[in-house]
Amino acid sequence: MANNVDLSIDFCGVKFKNPFLLSSSPVSNSAEMVAKSFDAGWGGVVFKTLNSDRLPIVHPSPRMACIDYGAKKGVAVQNVEMISDRPLKDNLTDFLYLKKNYP
């Protein structure tokens, strides 16, 4: 049974074939990973903030912390991947590849 439902969206002037985008995370870390997601049907990707190669990337440690709130206890995990630690040149090469092969 064919399903011809149009899920495309226009977000701030950018057209997506569907509203499902990869987040800025390890799954969007390289052209190979992003290409696999596009081949699987994802509508887009949000990359990590790019680094100019001049800023040192420092990952916080420890990355987990216990939280005591009265009788309740919890665990918090820090987001340690807010900026790409890949060289800028590698990221730009990936963008060119993806733009050419997945316009």
Model-assigned labels for residue ranges:
Residues 2-103:
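Active-site entrance/lid segments in N-terminal catalytic domains of soluble metabolic enzymes
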